[in-house]
Structure formats: structure tokens, C-alpha cells
């Protein structure tokens, strides 16, 4: 174990040593010469081995006659840390004597790991002078400039192509040999007096100003011009070198823009050589003479230096104006008064706002409680608790939730309007679609009906009854929330906007069976018997599969187990209203049977329950239907789209059932259990005939030929009773 710990410590030691070695090998030695004449040589440049950055001879400086030279023969005029080197390069010239004899001088130089900066210009001086720059490397590059004149140019100092021209230089980075050539495209002896020579040279921007005739004559005495060369450390980016860069403390590594590699720069507030480990030193902006780092405090006495910057400190009783960076006397009295007044005013405003918010909250709470009682919330709670166990969980929705769901009760969301109020389409936060029924404003009778509807629906859990999801009693009028049924009402399909939906006889029989089964369940199998009291086609909804959903239980009544009828105020819809109930005010399950009989007649005939366009004796569909049946004119009121040769007997049987349901005396009407069983028997018989027509041999084998051939009462009654028993069993189960 001790051996392993020892090895681990040794590994750490070597790692640290290697790191220091990497850092140390990029620093100059202690005894390096840093002067050549009057010019200071700064790292990464150096005069001798070990004094410049290793691996790049472009950083090696040769000191000749107290003048520094890079790449042996290019004189350096100035060093800087920003990745540029100012050097002096010879010009090229072509001169003519009075006889026209030509003398030429060309200039060429080689750059290895340095490159020509874009901050230089190729310049030509002279009349009809041509300046040409050729570069050689992986790619050869040439650029030229032409200066024209036939007389001395005006002395305006402009290098605009007359006697002088200049162009930008953008040589490829891989160029290593450069050559400037001067020439004259057409020599004239008249030029000799004012432009005997033409000159071509590279020069740093703004380092040469054309002086017309003086330069044309005297430029022969100027042999070299300042030129900028770009340099960088290595050929990797800052990200690639990471912590191994030679940038010292308080400096930043920057990727070289014109070429590969990187350069270093002292951070803001520091100055010095960023390539040395401690080269960047804090600048005292308060005392420095440098215009770059000098402070901007209006009074130097207020300047205070800090590491990497400065600040202006005013004496007690004064404040700093950041616009002018000067100290101004504090106005204590007015400032204090204004501050205290503002804070006091804000505190008062905040207190008033809090009180108003609290009062509004109390008012809203009281108003919601008032609406809750006004909308029968207490009565509903009392009745629900006294009605026995509920089969449905009734959710309480908030007023804000209902507003959002209906988009503020927008007219575009209205699904329908009727005696029980207005029904809106609502979208809940979970994107589920619901139907929201809103009672009419100012109609107190609606409250009782809404409470009654919640009370009734809380006792029902049936697949053919529209499901109550919840209610909202916090609003001025109560709201009920139901599941959304998408395919309209049966009335719409028979008489309204969806009359072209072409309900077949199979669809109509299915709807009749589902409605009859639902009523039978309400009358006989619900935990407390329920009479709907307003069965009509407008209260029967259809989903996309044409499954019937009985809705609108606002007029419904719960019948105590020990009673068969209730004495109530007559309520219902003309055309569907039981005449016996209308005359006596006694409500029982046979009233729903009558209303269902009218619905069945509508399904058979497609006629409205009450139509004033028909003759007086036939405006009620029950009378119209009874007369047609009695006179054997049933085919006149039942259209061809419903009745045909295949279903004639079924139509006649259904018509007979409808007639039984609408008898004047309630005791002569069948119970809904029986009606549902008879209609179910029609569907089973129809299915049996279809199957026997398709598979006659199998039918005879399974059922027995003697039963199929029997025509007596016994055989048919046995089949009917069996079917009826199955249907009744299905009704009683509800789901």
C-alpha cells in the first residue's frame, strides 16, 4: 500500500515538473541582449539562441551596425506586441538620361514565417509609370498600378493616378518571395525635366504622401520605405494550444486573424510584454503619461488606481457626475425630502392597493357564496345527501375556468338554445371538449330545474345517457358541464340541419332500441326510479357511431319506491305530452311511454310531432299516424327510403308498437321494459333472417327443420318470449 502511495506522489511530482518545463522553455534567458542600437528587442524576438521563441527563425534578430535585421537582411524599424513588425524595404526604379538611356533597379525579398500585411500599398510614382508586384509560393500572385501624365501634375498632394497611383496588396499567405518592378509604358524626352524616373515600392498605409513635382524629381534620394509584416506564434489556435501558450499572466490569447497561430495581448488596465510570464503589469491610470491608459476623471486629485482599472472618488459631501466624471455637491435637503416623500407615497399606494385587493377578494368571496346559495348550492347538497349514494362524481368548476372554456361565452361557441337555457361548446385546459349548459338570466324557475337535473343525473350511470361531468354555481346563473356529443340531435337528422344524413331503417331501429332500453333502465333499474318527462327527438343526441344519448333531465322526477305516480305541475313539450298527464296532473312512467311512442312515429315517418302545415285533424303526428294505420295508408307517411319489401313486416310491427305506446289510457300502454323487449325482438328476428338467407343449411342443421317450418302460435311465442327475457336482462344491467 505504501509503495503505491509513493508511486502516486512521484507521478504527481513529474507531472508538475513537466508542466513547469513546458512553461519555462518559452521564456528568454536572464542574460539575453535586449538592445540593438537605440531599438529595444522584445520577446518572442531575440538576438541569440535561447533568447527568442524556439522553432521559428523569423523571431531571430541579427544586430548589424547597431541596426536590427530579421531574416538576416531585412532591417527592422519597430517591434510591437500586436503581431506586426515594421521593416524597411528597398524601392525599384527605372531612370532615363537625356539621350533616353535606361537604368533599372529592382527590389526583391524573401519571407519565411512572416507574411505581407494587408495594411500596405503598392505605389507607383512617375509619368506613365508602371508598378508591378510579383509573389511566388504555392500560388503565384501579381498586382500592378499605372500612373499616367504628360505634364507635371497639380500640387494637390493626391495620389490619384496622375503622377502617382496606389493599390491594395493581398498576397497569399503561403507567398515567400516578393519582387517589385518599375517601368515606363512609353518614354518621352519631354519627361526628363520633371519625371526622369519611375518608382515602384511597397509602403505602409499613410506613410507616404505624394508631393507632385518634388517627389517626381527627388524620390531618387529615398531608397527605402516602411512596410508592415504580420507574425504569429506557432500555427495552432488558442483553443488548440490551451494552457501551453506562451501568454503570461494578466494577458489573453487571441487567434491571429490574417494567418495561422496566435498572439497575446495584455488585459484591460495592464501594459507590458504579454509574452513574458510577468510581462503585463498593472497601469496606474492616475499617474501614467500614456494617452491609451490615462484616466478620465475631470480632477486628477479624485483619481484612485485599482488593479486593472481606476475610479474617481469624491470627497465627503460630493457625488460623482458620471456624464462629466466630475464631483458635484450633494443636495441633501431636497434629495432627502424627495426620497422620503416618494417612499411614503409608495407605501401609502401599496397599502391602499392591498386594502382594495383584500376588499375585492372578500367581496368576490361573498358574491360567490351568494351565487352559490342563490343557485341552490345548499339545496343541492341537502338533496344529494338525502337521495342516497351517488353513481356519478360531480366536479365543481370555477367561474374563471368556464369563461376560458367558452371564450367568454362567445356566440360562435353556442351549440343550441332551448327552454332549459343555452348550450355552449367548451374546451377545458386538458383540451377535452365539453358541452356547457347555462340557465337563462333572471329565470328563477331554471335554478330548480338545474338542481333537479344534477340530482337526477347523479343517480344515473348508463351508456346511453349523456354523462354529467360537473357544475359551476359561483356564477350569476348556474352552469352544467356534460360530455360533448359531436353528431347533433335526432331532431337535426330527421327534420333539421342534418336531414340529408340518410338514416337507414337499421339505424332508426337501433336508436329506438337504445332509447327504449334507457327509459326502461330509468323506470325499473335505477337506484331510484326516474321519469324523464321530456322525451323528444331534440333531447336525443347522436355520436359519430349514431349511438343514442338521452339528454336534458331538467324536468325529470325521482319517484319514491313506495309510489307509482306523483302529482305535479304539468310540464313537457306539445306533441309529446301525455294527454292523461295533461288532464290529471298525475305523472307516472306511462307518460314517458307515450312520449317515446311519438319519437318512434317520427323515426318511422320522418314527420314532426306537431306540424301546423298539416290538416287540422292531422297536425298532431299521433292522430295522423293512427288515421293512416287504421285506413291502411301507412305507406303514405313512411317514405321509400325507410320502408321496402324486405322490412315491411318490421315496419308494420314497429308501427303497432308505436300505436300501443300512444294509447289515450295510460293503463293500456305497455311498460318500457316490454317496449324495449319487443323492439329488440325485431332486431334479433331481422338478424336471424339475414343469417338464414346466407346459410340455409347451417340454419336448418342448428335449429331444426321442424321449428323453422312450424307456423303455429306456440313456436313463435316461444321464440319471442326467449328474446324478450334476454332483452329485459340486458336493460336491467344498464351497463
Curated annotation (Swiss-Prot):
Residues annotated to bind ATP: 415-423, 437
Entry's induction text: Induced by salicylic acid (SA) or INA, methyl jasmonate, ethylene, wounding and pathogen infection. Accumulated in roots after Aluminum exposure. Up-regulated by GRP3.
Occurrences of domain Protein kinase (ranges): 409-692
Residues annotated as the enzyme's active site: 534
Any GO BP: response to virus
Glycosylation positions in this chain: 38, 56, 80, 90, 113, 140, 209, 235, 250, 296
Residues where Phosphothreonine is found: 398, 568, 573
Stored PANTHER family: WALL-ASSOCIATED RECEPTOR KINASE 1-RELATED, WALL-ASSOCIATED RECEPTOR KINASE-LIKE 21
Record note on quaternary structure: Interacts with the glycine-rich proteins GRP3 and GRP3S, and the type 2C protein phosphatase KAPP. Component of a 500 kDa complex, composed of WAK1, GRP3 and KAPP. Interacts with the oxygen-evolving enhancer protein 2 (OEE2).
Protein name: Wall-associated receptor kinase 1
Organism, scientific name: Arabidopsis thaliana
Amino acid at each position: 500500500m505504501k509503495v503505491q502511495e509513493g508511486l502516486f506522489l512521484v507521478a504527481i511530482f513529474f507531472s508538475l515538473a513537466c508542466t513547469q518545463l513546458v512553461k519555462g522553455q518559452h521564456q528568454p534567458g536572464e542574460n539575453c541582449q535586449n538592445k540593438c542600437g537605440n531599438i529595444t528587442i522584445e520577446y518572442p524576438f531575440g538576438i541569440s539562441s535561447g533568447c527568442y521563441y524556439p522553432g521559428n527563425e523569423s523571431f531571430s534578430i541579427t544586430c548589424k551596425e547597431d541596426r536590427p535585421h530579421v531574416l538576416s537582411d531585412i532591417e527592422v524599424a519597430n517591434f510591437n506586441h500586436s503581431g506586426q513588425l515594421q521593416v524597411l524595404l528597398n524601392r525599384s526604379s527605372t531612370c532615363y538620361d537625356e539621350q533616353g538611356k535606361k537604368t533599372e533597379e529592382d527590389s526583391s525579398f524573401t519571407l519565411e514565417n512572416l507574411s505581407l500585411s494587408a495594411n500596405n500599398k503598392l505605389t507607383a510614382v512617375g509619368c506613365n509609370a508602371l508598378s508591378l508586384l510579383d509573389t511566388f509560393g504555392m500560388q503565384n500572385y501579381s498586382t500592378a498600378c499605372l500612373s499616367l501624365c504628360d505634364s507635371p501634375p497639380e500640387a494637390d498632394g493626391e495620389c490619384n493616378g496622375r503622377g502617382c497611383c496606389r493599390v491594395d496588396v493581398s498576397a497569399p499567405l503561403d507567398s515567400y518571395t516578393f519582387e517589385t518592378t518599375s517601368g515606363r509604358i512609353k518614354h518621352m524626352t519631354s519627361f526628363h525635366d520633371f519625371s526622369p524616373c519611375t518608382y515602384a515600392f511597397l509602403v505602409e498605409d499613410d506613410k507616404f504622401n505624394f508631393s507632385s513635382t518634388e517627389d517626381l524629381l527627388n524620390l531618387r534620394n529615398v531608397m527605402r520605405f516602411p512596410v508592415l509584416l504580420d507574425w504569429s506564434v506557432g500555427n495552432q489556435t488558442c483553443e488548440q494550444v490551451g494552457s501551453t501558450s506562451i501568454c503570461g499572466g494578466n494577458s489573453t490569447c487571441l487567434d491571429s486573424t490574417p494567418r495561422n497561430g496566435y498572439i497575446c495581448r495584455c488585459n484591460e488596465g495592464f501594459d507590458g510584454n504579454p509574452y513574458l510570464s510577468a510581462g503585463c503589469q498593472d497601469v496606474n491610470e492616475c499617474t501614467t503619461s500614456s494617452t491609451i491608459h490615462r484616466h478620465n476623471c475631470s480632477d486628477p486629485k479624485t483619481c484612485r488606481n485599482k488593479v486593472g482599472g481606476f475610479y474617481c472618488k469624491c470627497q465627503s459631501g460630493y457625488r460623482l457626475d458620471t456624464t462629466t466624471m466630475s464631483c458635484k455637491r450633494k443636495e441633501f435637503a431636497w434629495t432627502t425630502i424627495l426620497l422620503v416623500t416618494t417612499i411614503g407615497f409608495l407605501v401609502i399606494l401599496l397599502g391602499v392597493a392591498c386594502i382594495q385587493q383584500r376588499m375585492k377578494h372578500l367581496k368576490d368571496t361573498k358574491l360567490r357564496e351568494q351565487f352559490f346559495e342563490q343557485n341552490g348550492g345548499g339545496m343541492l347538497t341537502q338533496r344529494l345527501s338525502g337521495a342516497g349514494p351517488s353513481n356519478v362524481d360531480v366536479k365543481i368548476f370555477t367561474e374563471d375556468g368556464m369563461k376560458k372554456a367558452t371564450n367568454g361565452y362567445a356566440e360562435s361557441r353556442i351549440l343550441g338554445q332551448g327552454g332549459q337555457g343555452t348550450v355552449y361548446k367548451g374546451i377545458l385546459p386538458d383540451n377535452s371538449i365539453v358541452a356547457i349548459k347555462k340557465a337563462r338570466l333572471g329565470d328563477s324557475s331554471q335554478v330548480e330545474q338545474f338542481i333537479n337535473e344534477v340530482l337526477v343525473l347523479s343517480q344515473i350511470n348508463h351508456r346511453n345517457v349523456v354523462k354529467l361531468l360537473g357544475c359551476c354555481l359561483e356564477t350569476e346563473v348556474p352552469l352544467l358541464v356534460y360530455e360533448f356529443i359531436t353528431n347533433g340531435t335526432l331532431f337535426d337528422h330527421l327534420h333539421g340541419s342534418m336531414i340529408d344524413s340518410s338514416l337507414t331503417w337499421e339505424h332508426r331501429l337501433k336508436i329506438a332500441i337504445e332509447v327504449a332500453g334507457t327509459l326502461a333502465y330509468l323506470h325499473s333499474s335505477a337506484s331510484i326510479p326516474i321519469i324523464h318527462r321530456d322525451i323528444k327527438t331534440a333531447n336525443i343526441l347522436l355520436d359519430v357511431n349514431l349511438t343514442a344519448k338521452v339528454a336534458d333531465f331538467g324536468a325529470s322526477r325521482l319517484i319514491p319506491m313506495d309510489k307509482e305516480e306523483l302529482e305535479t305541475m304539468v310540464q313537457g313539450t306539445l306533441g309529446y305530452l301525455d294527454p292523461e298527464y295533461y288532464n290529471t296532473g298525475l305523472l307516472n312512467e306511462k307518460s314517458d311511454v307515450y312520449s317515446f311512442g311519438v319519437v318512434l312515429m317520427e323515426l318511422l315517418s320522418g314527420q314532426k310531432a306537431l306540424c301546423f302545415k298539416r290538416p287540422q285533424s292531422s297536425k298532431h303526428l299521433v292522430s295522423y299516424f293512427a288515421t293512416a294505420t287504421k285506413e291502411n295508408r301507412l305507406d303514405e307517411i313512411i317514405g321509400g327510403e325507410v320502408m321496402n319489401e324486405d322490412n315491411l313486416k318490421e315496419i308494420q310491427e314497429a308501427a303497432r308498437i308505436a300505436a300501443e305506446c300512444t294509447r289515450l289510457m295510460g293503463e293500456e300502454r305497455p311498460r318500457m321494459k316490454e317496449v324495449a323487449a319487443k323492439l329488440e325482438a325485431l332486431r334479433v328476428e331481422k338478424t336471424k333472417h339475414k343469417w338464414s338467407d346466407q346459410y340455409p343449411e347451417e340454419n336448418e342443421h342448428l335449429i331444426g327443420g321442424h321449428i323453422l317450418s312450424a307456423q303455429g302460435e306456440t313456436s313463435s311465442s316461444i321464440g319471442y318470449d326467449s328474446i324478450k327475457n334476454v332483452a329485459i336482462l340486458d336493460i336491467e344491467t344498464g351497463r
